[in-house]
Amino acid sequence: MASQGTKRSYEQMETDGERQNATEIRASVGKMIGGIGRFYIQMCTELKLSDYEGRLIQNSLTIERMVLSAFDERRNKYLEEHPSAGKDPKKTGGPIYKRVDGKWMRELILYDKEEIRRIWRQANNGDDATAGLTHMMIWHSNLNDATYQRTRALVRTGMDPRMCSLMQGSTLPRRSGAAGAAVKGVGTMVMELIRMIKRGINDRNFWRGENGRKTRIAYERMCNILKGKFQTAAQRAMMDQVRESRNPGNAEFEDLTFLARSALILRGSVAHKSCLPACVYGPAVASGYDFEREGYSLVGIDPFKLLQNSQVYSLIRPNENPAHKSQLVWMACHSAAFEDLRVSSFIRGTRVVPRGKLSTRGVQIASNENMETMGSSTLELRSRYWAIRTRSGGNTNQQRASAGQISIQPTFSVQRNLPFDRTTIMAAFTGNTEGRTSDMRTEIIRMMESARPEDVSFQGRGVFELSDEKAANPIVPSFDMSNEGSYFFGDNAEEYDN
């Protein structure tokens, strides 16, 4: 559990490691990446993909999804117990795109899950290598975060669409373990808890009996994960109150929505990792790069270096802008969907535009889309600088949370001041007098009111030249403060509803 008294680094969460030193962590993360790469090469061989087809991000997504589905034990068990027409619970597959006579063709493939598991284990020295599976889940989650807005899901659970910057990881499966919990935003955790509370209100047996006991344990665990994300004593105390409730109901629901709103200013700590598609790792391994020997980190320069030297292609619909498609994937690769656009633009070296201005739909192609008119292009995933990924939430004075950055959740540890209109945020707190009035609430509101917009987050932190591998010379960018850089605000992105 992230930061439950045990401070483990991401890489340790990522590799289920006990305490390891930096070199061991880099090696075990490298081992995980190498395993994904070897698996991908083997799958491309099985499917007889050309080099170009193997570097197509849509093919990568299908192959990643197949292995995740092959290892989804709960769903596999469910499918076997509830057979549905036309679905073989023992098989998995998806669309593979091939270039035939100058045109892109869609081919639906089907494999035995057992066979996929065999190939995966073989690529990972016989292990199940769950860390590698989680890594792919986080990549898919980051891609969803950059592609879709969760307004509808927020409204359904009684939260405000303005809280979209708290929704990182909202599409991650529950089985994604500690590494998955670390990258979930405050809003995501709140939403999961609210769903449980609502079920408990509607279904009297939800908390009862043997099953109810398991439910209760899951509820308390989720409360602890969320508590660990908050950085102020008052927010944590409120989480204890929510967790210890005998019969979670309306009061807890109110407390949680209050906490979610408070997280817009008193930011939670949410991890950010650069998880790349398998079609980046595969060719790197094929070219002879030994990730385990060289070591790898998800939060340092390594993903940037890897992307500088990678060719990735994508299918492009007739009216889409390839540069915009590239931006979408770049943001997903660096988990930057909720980062300030000014910071992202500086690091990338080209202007990063808000979601509503992008002429591109998602990366996945629906089965009913016409392939006749489909083109393809190179994704531009390179960057001008690199920066360290953060998990602090950008609160200004260490030890105690203060003003985090509104409407964004920082990804990069780079100095910026906080453009925000406190009145807008505080307006969200008036008029809601339900739930408990408590010292904790008063304290939280007091902290928020005293947050100063002119504060600077990540004081003295900067970006680095790509030649500066040891991060020796930080370049502290100065930003034009006139516009605040939220990606989703004023937006009409598609909804994610599966």
Swiss-Prot record:
<keyword id="KW-0687">Ribonucleoprotein</keyword>
<dbReference type="GO" id="GO:0003723">
    <property type="term" value="F:RNA binding"/>
</dbReference>
<keyword id="KW-0694">RNA-binding</keyword>
<dbReference type="InterPro" id="IPR002141">
    <property type="entry name" value="Flu_NP"/>
</dbReference>
<dbReference type="GO" id="GO:0005198">
    <property type="term" value="F:structural molecule activity"/>
</dbReference>
<feature type="compositionally biased region" description="Basic and acidic residues">
    <location>
        <begin position="8"/>
        <end position="21"/>
    </location>
</feature>
<dbReference type="GO" id="GO:0043657">
    <property type="term" value="C:host cell"/>
</dbReference>
<keyword id="KW-0946">Virion</keyword>
<comment type="subunit">
    <text>Homomultimerizes to form the nucleocapsid. May bind host exportin-1/XPO1. Binds to viral genomic RNA. Protein-RNA contacts are mediated by a combination of electrostatic interactions between positively charged residues and the phosphate backbone and planar interactions between aromatic side chains and bases.</text>
</comment>
<keyword id="KW-0543">Viral nucleoprotein</keyword>
<keyword id="KW-1160">Virus entry into host cell</keyword>
<comment type="similarity">
    <text>Belongs to the influenza viruses nucleoprotein family.</text>
</comment>
<dbReference type="Pfam" id="PF00506">
    <property type="entry name" value="Flu_NP"/>
</dbReference>
<keyword id="KW-1048">Host nucleus</keyword>
<keyword id="KW-0167">Capsid protein</keyword>
<dbReference type="GO" id="GO:0075732">
    <property type="term" value="P:viral penetration into host nucleus"/>
</dbReference>
<keyword id="KW-0945">Host-virus interaction</keyword>
<comment type="function">
    <text>Encapsidates the negative strand viral RNA, protecting it from nucleases. The encapsidated genomic RNA is termed the ribonucleoprotein (RNP) and serves as template for transcription and replication. The RNP needs to be localized in the host nucleus to start an infectious cycle, but is too large to diffuse through the nuclear pore complex. NP comprises at least 2 nuclear localization signals that are responsible for the active RNP import into the nucleus through cellular importin alpha/beta pathway.</text>
</comment>
<dbReference type="GO" id="GO:0019029">
    <property type="term" value="C:helical viral capsid"/>
</dbReference>
<dbReference type="GO" id="GO:1990904">
    <property type="term" value="C:ribonucleoprotein complex"/>
</dbReference>
<keyword id="KW-1139">Helical capsid protein</keyword>
<protein>
    <recommendedName>
        <fullName>Nucleoprotein</fullName>
    </recommendedName>
</protein>
<feature type="short sequence motif" description="Unconventional nuclear localization signal">
    <location>
        <begin position="1"/>
        <end position="18"/>
    </location>
</feature>
<feature type="region of interest" description="Disordered">
    <location>
        <begin position="1"/>
        <end position="21"/>
    </location>
</feature>
<dbReference type="GO" id="GO:0019013">
    <property type="term" value="C:viral nucleocapsid"/>
</dbReference>
<feature type="short sequence motif" description="Bipartite nuclear localization signal">
    <location>
        <begin position="198"/>
        <end position="216"/>
    </location>
</feature>
<dbReference type="GO" id="GO:0046718">
    <property type="term" value="P:symbiont entry into host cell"/>
</dbReference>
<keyword id="KW-1163">Viral penetration into host nucleus</keyword>
<dbReference type="GO" id="GO:0042025">
    <property type="term" value="C:host cell nucleus"/>
</dbReference>
